[in-house]
């Protein structure tokens, strides 16, 4: 698990942001609990995530796990029908298009896109456009 001082710092960040710790867990200003679900496709990851989940619960966060088959997982990813997923984003040795697909605002709400986090930020878009416009490897590396 996470060291106690790190958990204390995390709780301070949450309380500074307006969350209140109560017997029902972390509550927002409307007394709604902080809760989310982690969507998995591999049941072996459940065991790996347990220390993380236990730490979140220590903070008063109600977190659950849902493991589904590959078809349902893909369908839910494509529709952005999840709170959190555990995945890796494949990269190439020449950065460019995949970063645009993962992080560009134009991809944030398109079903089936790869911008799973729903990032929509003009600063990120400008950086990605600079990356795609790079003419040399040095420019590409600097932009990445």
For each predicted feature, which ranges?
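Solvent-exposed loop/turn segments at secondary-structure junctions
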Residues: 42-46, 70-72, 90-94
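Short beta-strand-centered segments that line the small-molecule binding cleft or hinge
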Residues: 95-99
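Alpha-helix boundary/capping detector
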Residues: 40, 82, 103-104
